[in-house]
């Protein structure tokens, strides 16, 4: 597992819940790939998580991945909370079912394939890749609205 990859990711939501988008940049050396998508009825946290999932799913072999995101929910979930949720049967510290369990389980599966370092950065603070991911997410929302496909 020697290939080192950087994944920058962000999610956006117009209304929460509402129409949402996600954006990601995969970087391996000098090569970059941009990814994005959108959904009609979602939340900001789901889009943040989806950005990371889609980026990790795009990798064709096991890698060392540095995931950089402005989502404390995502970083803390993966580095601090996940083991407790699993130990308690997917119940949080308030004894309530963990939200977005489907996405946490997918991230857990992907973390078995890749060696992942989760890194938090402050959002909307001039970080070039984070700003680009935000633009990708918002662009995906705009595209979905223009197409009007999948509208409930």
Swiss-Prot record:
**In which compartments does the protein localize?**
Cytoplasm
Q: Which PROSITE patterns match?
A: RNASE_H_1 (PS50879)
> Recorded GO terms, molecular function?
magnesium ion binding; nucleic acid binding; RNA-DNA hybrid ribonuclease activity
Q: Name one GO cellular component term.
A: cytoplasm
E.C. designation(s): 3.1.26.4
**Where would I find the RNase H type-1 domain in this sequence?**
1-142
Q: Which family does it belong to?
A: Belongs to the RNase H family.
Q: What's the subunit arrangement here?
A: Monomer.
Q: Return the protein name.
A: Ribonuclease H
Where does this protein come from, organism-wise?
Answer: Geobacter metallireducens (strain ATCC 53774 / DSM 7210 / GS-15)
């Amino acid at each position: 597992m020697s290939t080192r990859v950087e994944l920058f990711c962000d999610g956006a939501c117009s209304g929460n819940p509402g129409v949402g988008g996600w954006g990601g940049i995969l970087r391996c050396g000098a090569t970059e790939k941009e990814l994005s998508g959108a959904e009609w009825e979602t939340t900001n946290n789901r889009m943040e998580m989806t950005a990371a999932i889609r980026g990790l799913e795009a990798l064709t072999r096991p890698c060392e991945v540095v995931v950089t995101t402005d989502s404390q929910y995502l970083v803390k979930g993966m580095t601090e909370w996940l083991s407790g949720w699993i130990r308690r049967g997917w119940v949080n510290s308030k004894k309530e079912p963990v939200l977005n369990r489907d996405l946490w389980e997918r991230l857990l599966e992907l973390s078995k394939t890749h060696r992942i370092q989760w890194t938090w950065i402050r959002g909307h603070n001039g970080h070039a890749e984070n700003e680009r991911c935000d633009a990708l997410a918002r662009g995906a929302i705009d595209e979905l609205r223009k197409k009007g496909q999948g509208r409930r």
